[in-house]
Amino acid sequence: MKGVYFVSGIDTDIGKTVATGMLAKQLLQQGKSVITQKPVQTGCQDIAEDIAVHRKIMGIPMQEADKRRLTMPEIFSYPASPHLAARLDGRALDLDKIRTATQELAAQYEIVLVEGAGGLMVPLTEKLLTIDYIQQQAYPVILVTSGRLGSINHTLLSFAALKQYGIRLHSLVFNHIHDSRDAHIAQYSLSYLKCRLKADFSEAEWMELAKTDAV
């Protein structure tokens, strides 16, 4: 594993932040040089909350790249999708700033995990969706799903979108965070999605994130 990977989810509140932090922690334990980035953080004033969570999970302090805002190049105060948060804050989202920050991180670290906002179809600007940006940058995707009701539908829709855009799926992360809602649905969702991943993206990895890993 080397390069820049985009971490997305099938929906909001699916556990992308914890999944990103846990994956970064595992890579650190393997001796890899890894950093996480939250290119657009909404609902914050100064420090990207998701980056703080990543560092806590990774067991490391805020890094020099964090202090230089390379890991959090765009922060908006209103908790909404990036395009709406930018509009309400009265300024445009700077895609060049984000690209430059990611490139600088990639030059310093072996692996960069870029955590997106929401799912693949979340608008970054009025004209650009998150999936458009991923396609432009040719980033492989790490997709986070779970076993809650509706996850199969949302996961398969995400699969279809990735295929339509010609984007490589690196891995599907099954987050057990919602298992307690309905154990039957969670277990069936796991087995079904595991089979579908093998059929639809045969080279992609299957990963699982235990609920006890959450912070």
UniProtKB/Swiss-Prot annotation:
The active site is at K38. Substrate binds at T42. Its EC number is 6.3.3.3. It catalyses: (7R,8S)-7,8-diammoniononanoate + CO2 + ATP = (4R,5S)-dethiobiotin + ADP + phosphate + 3 H(+). GO terms for molecular function: ATP binding; dethiobiotin synthase activity; magnesium ion binding. It is found in: Cytoplasm. Its cofactor is Mg(2+). ATP binds at D13, I14, G15, K16, T17, V18, D50, E115, G116, A117, G118, N175, H176. Its main location: cytoplasm. GO terms for biological process: biotin biosynthetic process. Keywords: ATP-binding, Biotin biosynthesis, Cytoplasm, Ligase, Magnesium, Metal-binding, Nucleotide-binding. HAMAP family: BioD. Catalyzes a mechanistically unusual reaction, the ATP-dependent insertion of CO2 between the N7 and N8 nitrogen atoms of 7,8-diaminopelargonic acid (DAPA, also called 7,8-diammoniononanoate) to form a ureido ring. Homodimer. This is ATP-dependent dethiobiotin synthetase BioD. It comes from Neisseria meningitidis serogroup C / serotype 2a (strain ATCC 700532 / DSM 15464 / FAM18).
